[in-house]
Amino acid sequence: MSHYLVHLRDVPMIKKFVLGLLLLVALGLVGLNSIGITPAFIVYGPGVASGIGAKLLCSAEYVIGSERDQAFEDLVQYSPILSQISVRYDDAERAVTSSLFGMKEKTASFIPGLGCAVDYANYPQRSRLIVQQDEASSAPWPAGSAVSGIDPELQALLETLLEQDNSRGLNTRALLLVHGGEIKAEVYGQGMTSESKLLGWSMAKSLNAIMLGNLEMRGFLNLSDGPGFRQWSADARSAITSTALLTMTDGLDFSEDYNPGDDATAMLFTSPSSSDYVLARPLAADPGARFNYSSGTANLLSRLYTDTLGGPQAAYDNYRQQIFKPMGFQHAVFETDASGVFMGSSYFYASARDWARMGQLMLNGGVLNGHRLVSEAWIARATSPNQSENDKAYGYQWWLNRGNESLRFPELPEDVYYANGNRQQLVMVFPSQQAVIVRLGWTSGRYPVADNFARILEAL
């Protein structure tokens, strides 16, 4: 049986706990640090490790359809200690259970159309959602799945870049080019296809912003106003506007270090309601003054979307009718947490073609497939620098090349903006070139964005 199924499988729970503690002591501080165990990890790590294992392996199994060995290898890239988790797959229930040394066991379950989330007692909201599913369309992209405009020279270039990437261990899984509103080239890594639903991590933030822009266009909210969270009504956080949340200049005290015990890991992997976790965070700076990248803020935007529409079911239905269908998404899943609120910080799984639809919507000024989803004015604001004192090159959950004294990518056009996710996920929009480039993969280090994308632009 494979290694990820049998760690400490036959040891009773109490013995697992004791063995785990003895192992921590026996390894010593230097050895512990070398495999990812710090004093903070001893306190917070088991819950985080069990949560990330259950959640990511569940989605890999039942959303992506990854090979289990590959999914486990991807997981362990985050920390060597994750190689020590025990994992149990329950195909009958479509659930994955994980624990570290038998401690803090967590189970994530799959719901068709909703993907996976860690289960928590007394949080039935997600399981009660009525989910819609549609057959893929054979209409031409971006309305459907048909692609007929492949350019042989551009296709050959992307094939070369994919081969070069993966010969260097960059693990590129999809690379796609849209030019002039058509897919001109697309390539996929081993085991991946044009239908593979790939995790965008923080690129979900950019879709989250579009969803709020849609509500603003339809008159449901004014982004210049506050979000109206009752938890903030009696203190200084009431001064935070929805625009400050979109530009991550809200001033909330939220750490995004991804170490055990920090806010991001606690929110993502140990909290039944991600937005409730962030609603309790205090201010660390005056609203509007400083940019602080925060997945917590993104999940507050998801909460705003849900509250504005009247609850999880109404939010889900609105997303399906006003976003998913008009955009022509074919192979995409937006996961929620146990409370039924979209995980706007992290958990949108979609094919490369679906991710490209998001970029094309922005490039088209808010229109796709004959539907206006956001206003032109919203697009202009979303892609303009914020007014913070420390980092202006960020719009409404979209990264900007311009805004600071120097460009983020000096080799690329100044007007570029992009969605960006962990492991070097990218949807980059090039207005001057009328192009969108999508890159999906699992790269733990740097990716040659400027070099590769400049080569593609030169070939247009």
Placement of each model-derived feature along the sequence:
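Structured C-terminal helix/loop/strand segments within mature extracytoplasmic catalytic/sensor domains
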Residues: 37-50, 63, 71, 419-460
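Short, well-structured active-site flanking segments
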Residues: 68, 214-233, 255-256, 308-335, ...
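A short, well-structured edge-of-sheet supersecondary motif
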Residues: 98, 155-192, 427-428, 434-438
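Active-site SXXK
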Residues: 181, 198-223, 245, 301-305, ...
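Active-site-proximal alpha-helical segments within enzyme catalytic domains
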Residues: 209, 296-306, 344-368, 425-441
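Active-site Gly/Thr loop motif
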Residues: 329-333, 380, 384-437
